[in-house]
Design a protein with these regions (language model features):
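ASCE RecA-like P-loop NTPase motor cores
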Residues: 3-133
């Protein structure tokens, strides 16, 4: 079981974001490769987006960005399962910082400090895990 092995590595897709509970030191790093926007060919999301746009709203922010914010919060929740859990969440999608909607998405995350410095991240992981395998 992954919970019993601190040196293990679990790789998963978006479907793994729900129902996974690995509290404690076995989970110290969660990597999110891209912002989890809904698929553009999802008919339900497209209908919601079109409806809001047709009624003068911003469908992208109301539907797509809101959905992505919820999923980002869920994804980061894989790391922080208790008040004593510590770790690094690495979001590899630069749009989280560069896009106009990035600040909206960042507000969905738990309290954190932000860095793009690899050494800062590695040092944090060393402190958390006691080493870096």
């Amino acid at each position: 079981c992954i919970r019993d092995r601190e040196e293990s590595c679990l790789v998963g897709t978006l479907g793994l974001w729900q129902g996974v509970d690995v509290p404690g030191p076995s989970c110290s790093l969660v990597i999110i490769d891209r912002i989890p926007f809904p698929r553009p060919d999802d008919p339900l999301m497209s209908a919601r987006l079109d409806f809001i746009n047709e009624h003068g709203g911003n469908g992208f922010m109301s539907v797509s960005a809101s959905h992505a914010a919820l999923l980002l919060a869920q994804g980061t929740g894989r790391l922080l399962r208790s008040s004593t859990d510590r770790g690094v969440i690495a979001v590899m999608d630069s749009r989280l910082v560069t896009a106009r909607y990035g600040s909206y998405l960042r507000k969905s995350l738990p309290p954190y400090w932000e860095t793009t410095n690899t050494e800062v991240v590695l040092n944090s992981l060393r402190r958390i895990t006691g080493s870096l395998h």
